Structure formats: C-alpha cells, structure tokens
Amino acid sequence: MRRALRAVLWSVAGLVLLYGTTAVVLFVLMGRSNLVAGKTLALVPGPAFALLPMETMWCQARKGDLAVGQAAPDFELAARDGSGRVRLSSVRQEKPVVLVFASYTCPPFRREMPGVRKVYEDYRDRAAFYFVYIEEAHARDVWPLESNVRDKVVYSTPQDLAERTGLATTCAKAMQIDFPMLVDDVDNSVARAYTAWPTRFYVVGRDGRIAFKSRPGPFGFEAAPLRQALAELLPSPAGSSAGTP
C-alpha cells in the first residue's frame, strides 16, 4: 500500500515539475521570439498555461512534418471574399502555387508583407499565389503583445469561421493584399497539416509535390528566400526582368 502511494506521489511530483519547467522554458522562448528585426516586442502579462498549446504548435512548426519532394496535403478552403471554395489540387494544374500562411496579429508578417507583395508582382504570371489566413499568432486573450497595442492590431481569438473571415478581411484591407485569400477552418486543420503556425511559406509544384518550404515564423518568414526559390524554380523568360529584386 505504501509503495503504491509513493508511486502516485512521485507521479504527481513529476507532473508538477514537468509543467513548471515547461512554463519557464515557454517564457524564455517567448522572450527570444520577441526579438524581431532588432526590436524587442515586449509581452503584455498573461496566464502562462494558456500559452502552452501555442508553444506546442511553434515547436511542431520548427520540427516540421513535411519535406521538399513530398506530396503536399490537399485541402479545400473557403475564399475570404465569398466567391466559393478553392481546392489546391485544382489550382496547381496550370501553375505552381505559392502558399502564404499568416494572421494579422503576427508582427513579423506585417513587417515582411511589403516584400511579399513585390514577389507577387514579379511572379504572378508564372505562379498562383494564395494567402491562407490561419489561427491568430498573438490574440489579446491568449498571447498579447505591446507592439500590437502600439500598432492598434488588438483582436481576440475568432470563435467561428465568420469571425475569422471578418478579421481576415480587415487584414487584407490594412495590408493591401491583392492576391486571393483563403480562410482556414476554426479546427485549424490546414495549418496543422502544414505546420504553418505562426507564419510560413510553401511552394507546391504542378506535380503536387512541395518545391519549397520556408523556416517557420517568426524568424523564417522572409520574402528573400521565397524570391530566391521562385527564381530557381521559375526562370525568367528571355528578355524579361521579372524575378529580379
């Protein structure tokens, strides 16, 4: 009896130690992830354990489940503008597809979007671009940032597809996103399939295989590697200057 009780107590102690250590590591990583472009994006205090699912997704994204050369998971999502649903396996038939995964509350996305627009302008004739709006990176009820308060980008987690679509529309207008935007369902199935949270780029070839996969955000969301990948995958036609920085 004592042996069984001792085993239970050790198990409880182990769980307490695990969650305590995870919380400490989480705050260290959050401090690191807030160092973007040489600026400190200070955290607004919030409940630590509410962030554990977010940290889990970030760790999964760093590891990644997909590799270049593998078949890209097919999906069908609603277009933000209400024009219908879009299936990846259909749109890639004519051109390679560039997938931009992000959300409005992600500061690195907002910082890098002008460069992404320039890549789109240079390659729109040779690749199909789709923005996939995913779960918020820094919703005020989960992982708020002072930089979002300063930029007046303060939003709670959308509770259904309609709310997420509304926030996606706000994002599209504010960030001047000209290419089609799709909205991930609130089960976040596409973002999970692509380990895309908080931000990530993919290029899917006409053969349905992954031709390029960026590092995950916040550090991997950069337009320059995407441009380089497209320059290698889609050489400019003779006499064209498209694709140059």
What is each of the regions a protein language model found here?
Residues 110-175:
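Structural microenvironment flanking redox-active thiols in thiol-disulfide oxidoreductases
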Residues 34-35, 52, 185-245:
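Thiol-/selenol-based redox modules, centered on thioredoxin-like
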Residues 85-87, 211-212:
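Generic structural signal for well-ordered beta-strand positions
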Residues 79-81, 204-205:
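Short, acidic, Ser/Thr-enriched surface-loop or helix-capping motifs
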Residues 95-96, 177-180, 195-202:
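Structural micro-motif
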Residues 78, 89-92, 217-218:
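A generic structural motif
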Residues 1-76:
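N-terminal targeting signals for export/organelle localization
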Residues 86-116, 128-133:
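Short active-site neighborhood of thiol/selenol oxidoreductases, capturing the structured segment around
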